Amino acid sequence: MSQQVVIFDTTLRDGEQALQASLSVKEKLQIALALERMGVDVMEVGFPVSSPGDFESVQTIARTIKNSRVCALARCVEKDIDVAAESLKVAEAFRIHTFIATSPMHIATKLRSTLDEVIERAVYMIKRARHYTDDVEFSCEDAGRTPIADLARVVEAAINAGAKTINIPDTVGYTMPFEFSNIITGLYERVPNIDQAIISVHTHDDLGLAVGNAIAAVHAGARQVEGAMNGIGERAGNCSLEEVIMAIKVRKDIMNVQTRINHNEIWRTSQTVSQICNMPIPANKAIVGTGAFAHSSGIHQDGVLKNRENYEIMTPESIGLNQVQLNLTSRSGRAAVKHRMEEMGYKETDYNMDHLYDAFLKLADKKGQVFDYDLEAIAFINKQQEEPEHFRMDYFSVQSGSSDIATASVKLACGDEIKAEAANGNGPVDAIYQAINRVTGYDVELVKYDLSAKGHGKDALGQVDIVVTYNGRRFHGVGLATDIVESSAKAMVHVLNNIWRAAEVEKELQRKAQNKENNKETV
């Protein structure tokens, strides 16, 4: 049996389903590139048949990613399979992941079918997918509640049909680790052709057992683990990939398996996902939480000072967290800033040096000293906002005092036109949002406002993340500045640009669809 565990990331498919606002194509690509740097073997990046936007995202990522295999999800439906293949065909190599429910409950109440019909349908769809690629994965949805004899029948038929990877999902997070281990062992005992496929697992955290179930399955012989960075996903989330990866590395003495992951990229990838998805990482989160390597007890602190291994089973450096932070000033040149970015693991292609250095100088003039966390924050924000902007803040002013009423004046560039407005609001942030909305004419509703500090002390940068609804859809915006009102204004301008870009994308997709129809009529 292979000692290599395939890491299958579903942050951009199962993980994204849990987000309050959908990600843009650019944001998804940014996460995909981070996952590629980290070395995931397979990344599932969308469900192409679900929407034209998802199709475009999958296609864009498939065209860009070279070192990880790109995968798309499809139900056991002909159209799903065909659309998935169409979105992926620009990739050098790709995988189609198809699935159908196998538990008695799902078959009877959801599918209104029989096990024999489910097997027949699965076999047909796997063969259809094989017309497009040799790399087909099949999932037995709700496998955790499927009798082992039924599960073995489905798995054997799927392998005979050509599936190279068989995924065993604990879809509702119901199974206990010892049960999940027995399921994997049972399949190895009952399925005669099981050596012709890789057995995969996909676990959910409804009972807090997703990682435990994944580790138990690997110990029992599974050789692919599916999950998401930071454990994001439906309901209570997916299996946290960073936890499984580090468990395999730290406990190699009993696991006897390995992954191809670049462990030095774990921290950075986790932060990228957290920031783009607007999902803060709990301080006590294993591996990547801010408290994961903190020691507050006097006894523990004394022990760590004498020997870190007394209370640390891994080091911050083992996940790419460099705790030595160099401060820069406004006198630091471009070379010094570039060198520091390289030391933190960034390549020149990860950021625009001109934009980064300009933002660095402005921040250094305000703060005096700029630290690593400042550089990372402005690099992230610049990456988020480097797309063409229709709206740009030219000027703003807010007047407020001890009363609830504040007055804001704003001047915005709207395309080639400069517009100005003023408005009152319940506090400075509300006032500036009212003024911005008057300028743009967008009737947006603020549904979430988060403020977080990037750095320490009174000079910390303030990052504002907002979620708004517009025409029934949710959009995310982010702003960063030393002033909270300025951060808030930047976040609103960013979200309005995202709304504008989404509308432009929809227009382009409609234009392409119309051209396609016109070409059909001509033929």
Swiss-Prot record:
Keyword Cytoplasm attached: yes
Signal peptide per UniProt: none
Binding site for Mn(2+): 14, 202, 204, 238
GO terms under biological process: L-leucine biosynthetic process
Taxonomy, superkingdom: Bacteria
InterPro entries tied to this protein: 2-IPM_HCS-like, 2-isopropylmalate_synth_dimer, AIPM/Hcit_synth_CS, Aldolase_TIM, LeuA/HCS_post-cat, LeuA_allosteric_dom_sf, LeuA_bact_synth, PYR_CT
Record region (Regulatory domain): 392-523
UniProt keyword list: Amino-acid biosynthesis, Branched-chain amino acid biosynthesis, Cytoplasm, Leucine biosynthesis, Manganese, Metal-binding, Transferase
Record-linked Gene3D superfamilies: 1.10.238.260, 3.30.160.270, Aldolase class I (3.20.20.70)
GO molecular function: 2-isopropylmalate synthase activity; acetyl-CoA C-acetyltransferase activity; manganese ion binding
Entry GO CC: cytosol
Pathway: Amino-acid biosynthesis; L-leucine biosynthesis; L-leucine from 3-methyl-2-oxobutanoate: step 1/4
SMART domains: LeuA_dimer (SM00917)
Principal cellular location given in the protein's record: cytoplasm
SUPFAM superfamilies: 2-isopropylmalate synthase LeuA, allosteric (dimerisation) domain, Aldolase
Cofactor: Mn(2+)
Subcellular location, record wording: Cytoplasm
Domain spans labelled Pyruvate carboxyltransferase: 5-267
EC numbers: 2.3.3.13
HAMAP family from the UniProt entry: LeuA_type1
Cited function: Catalyzes the condensation of the acetyl group of acetyl-CoA with 3-methyl-2-oxobutanoate (2-ketoisovalerate) to form 3-carboxy-3-hydroxy-4-methylpentanoate (2-isopropylmalate).
Similarity-based family: Belongs to the alpha-IPM synthase/homocitrate synthase family. LeuA type 1 subfamily.
Subunit relationships: Homodimer.
Protein name as it appears in the record: 2-isopropylmalate synthase
Organism: Enterobacter sp. (strain 638)
